[in-house]
C-alpha cells in the first residue's frame, strides 16, 4: 500500500522514474513563502467559519510559522518523494503539530493551492520588476538631461538619417519602458483575483468565505468560476508577454551598445564594471553585459512560447502539464530582473564620445532633409520638388566626395538658382537639431524639458 498523502487507493508506490518525472520540489520550492502565506490565510478562514476548532487553528498557525522559520534559516529538508512544496510543507507541519495538520487541507485542493501560490509569486515579482524598470527609466532620463546637447546620428536602416541628440535617443527608451510598466500593471490588475477555495475544480460543500481569504492575501476579489480558477494560467502568459516585450526593448538598446562600443563606431565607452577581457587578445574590452542582455531576451521570449504551447491543447480543468508553467516563468522573470539591473548600471556608467558622435552626425548627408525644408520655406517650393532638388544636390556632393556643407554655392545654384548663402546655416548638425522644435522633437530644449518632466514623474530612488 502506498503511504503517499494521496495513496489510499494505491497498492504500491510509484516507479523511481515516475517519482523523478513527477516531482517539482526541485523548482517549486521557491513558492514556499507564498504557500505558507496562503495556508495561513486559509486556516484563519476555516477557523472564523467554525469549520476547524480554535485549538487546531492555533496549532496549525504556530506550526506553519515554525516551518517558515526553518526554511528561512536553511534548515528545512526538501525531499523529492514528497513531490512538491505543498506536500513538503504539510509533511513537516504534521511532524511538528501532529494529526491536526491533516485538517489544513479541508476545503482545499493542490489545484487551487498552486494557482494561488503562483499568482502571489508573479504578483510579487511584477511589483519588483516595476520598480526596476522605473530605476532604468530614471537612469536614462538623467543621462538624457546631461546629454541634451550632445549631437549624434539618428539612423534608419542603420544608415545615417538625420541628426538627433544623445539625450533624445535615451528618452526614446524611457517611453518604451513606460509602456512596459503599463503592461506589467495591467497584467497585475488582471491576476489579482484569488483562486483559493475553488478546490479541485467544482468548489466545495464547506461554508467557506472566499472573500475573506482573498482580502487576507491582498487580492481584489475571489475568482468567479471554480473551473477557470484552476485551469487558468493567463496570468503567467500575460506576464511573460509583457516581460518579452520589455526584453525586446532592452535587447535593442543592448545591440546598440555592442555596436557603438566597437572600434568601428566608437560612439560610447562602457565602464570596466560592465566589460570583460580576452584570454588571448590583451587589447580587448568586450561588452559582455550588453551581449548577455541581448541573449537573455531570447530566453525570456522562449519561456512565453513554451508555456503557450503547453497550454494550447489542455481540456478543462487541471492537467499535470500545467506543472511546466513554473520553471519557465521563474527563469524568465528573474532573467528580466537581472537584465534590468545590468542595463541600469551600464547606462549610469556609460560615456558618450561627443566628438565622434558629432562627426558621425554630419556624415552620410544627414542634413539633406534640412536642405529640403529650407527650399520649401524660403523658395515656396512643393516638398516633392524640394526632395528632388535636394537629391540632385546630394548627388553632386557625393560625386565630389564632400559633405553638403562643403559643396560650393555655385554648385548648388547650378542645380537650383534660387539657393542663397543663407542655406549654409541649416546644414550644420547643431542647427539641424535645434530646429526640430515640434512636440517630441530632438531640439535640446525639448529634450531638457522632457527629461526633467520624467524625473519629476519618476521621483527619487526608493531606498
Swiss-Prot record:
SUPFAM superfamilies, sorted: L-aspartase-like
Reactions catalysed, as given in the entry: 2-(N(omega)-L-arginino)succinate = fumarate + L-arginine
Subcellular location: Cytoplasm
GO biological process entries: arginine biosynthetic process via ornithine; L-arginine biosynthetic process
Enzyme class, spelled out: lyase
EC identifiers of the protein: 4.3.2.1
Main location group: cytoplasm
UniProt keywords, alphabetically: Amino-acid biosynthesis, Arginine biosynthesis, Cytoplasm, Lyase
Annotated metabolic or biological route of this protein: Amino-acid biosynthesis; L-arginine biosynthesis; L-arginine from L-ornithine and carbamoyl phosphate: step 3/3
Cellular component, GO annotation: cytosol
Superkingdom as given in the UniProt entry: Bacteria
GO MF annotations in UniProt: argininosuccinate lyase activity
Pfam annotation, one family: ASL_C2
CDD domains assigned to the protein according to its UniProt record, in alphabetical order: Argininosuccinate_lyase
Keyword hit for Lyase: yes
Family statement: Belongs to the lyase 1 family. Argininosuccinate lyase subfamily.
Protein name (database record): Argininosuccinate lyase
